[in-house]
Curated annotation (Swiss-Prot):
Pfam families named in the record: DAGK_cat, YegS_C
Record's keyword annotation contains Zinc: no
Record-linked InterPro entries: ATP-NAD_kinase_N (IPR017438), Diacylglycerol/lipid_kinase (IPR005218), Diacylglycerol_kinase_cat_dom (IPR001206), Lip_kinase_YegS (IPR022433), Lipid_Phosphate_FormReg (IPR050187), NAD/diacylglycerol_kinase_sf (IPR016064), YegS/DAGK_C (IPR045540)
Protein's UniProt name: Probable lipid kinase YegS-like
Residues annotated to bind ATP: 47, 73-79, 102
Family: Belongs to the diacylglycerol/lipid kinase family. YegS lipid kinase subfamily.
Cellular-component GO terms for this entry: cytoplasm; plasma membrane
MF annotations from Gene Ontology: ATP binding; lipid kinase activity; magnesium ion binding
Cofactor note: Binds 1 Mg(2+) ion per subunit. Ca(2+) may be able to substitute.
Annotated organism of origin: Chromohalobacter salexigens (strain ATCC BAA-138 / DSM 3043 / CIP 106854 / NCIMB 13768 / 1H11)
Amino acid sequence: MNETIQPCEHDGDTWLILNGKSAQLPEVREAVGRVREAGHHLAVRVTWEGGDGVRLAREASEAGIARVIAGGGDGTVNEIVGGLMQLASETRPALGILPLGSANDFAGGLGLPEEPYEALRVALETPPRRVDVGTLGDDYFINLASGGFGAQITNSTPAPLKRLLGGGAYSLMGMLKAWNYQPYQGRLRFPDGERNVPLFLLALGNGCQAGGGQQLAPLAKIDDGLLELLIVRHFTSLREMKQLIDELENLPESGDFVEYLQVPWVEFESEHALPLNLDGEPCFHENFRAALMPGALCLAAPEGSALLSHQ
């Protein structure tokens, strides 16, 4: 196997925008070499610092590239999606995904192969389909936005522990922090109603899972124009926690602690900033409106993906 990724004969029909942390992985270099040997004109661009994914998405569009592949974890995908969404729709390249790193919730929900070569083949060869993209304020997300307890766990998990334990890190930090958690009081508005709730957890799903495989929006489809809205109210006793867990198993439309709705948009107002994660990327908002842009992005998703409506 070659020590370096050999350059294409020309600049490529597709760009792989690769997270710099993954650029030296032997399995990635081997996969790139194999798809090139199979005849794909794939050029590689590597990110070095924050904002590079946005810049490279723009440069790909300016170069007339029809498809870009986000090589990295959920954060890399989120940054490149944000870059693509800043472009005019008629010049916006399609997106493929090469899942790498410790957090690949969107790729996992899509059912993408974990082996780099097979994932690259899907990203390169699958006809792209139009899918929805979420907006929250001025930010974008393609998978899931979570707020409250879930976001607090993810933000406070040390990066080395996250890499070491994978999804288990989230459960560990959850057990350590649950009994000191303070709920977030806020008002939620959506087309058919509003709620004043002490929030334990809030999830807005375009995709289905977050936090290392936790299914927060199991009915989600990325092409139906609807957000999955999961509201989990604060609990104060073991008995209430047991009921909450039972309701999470069944996802009632209107339970004592859990509500699961499908809405085109939702608004949140609070006197205090709510910790949020958009595709795993942390932020804080006191007030926001979240919605979907239906069919805004073309995505190379595997045939038969559970996140597609198959219409």
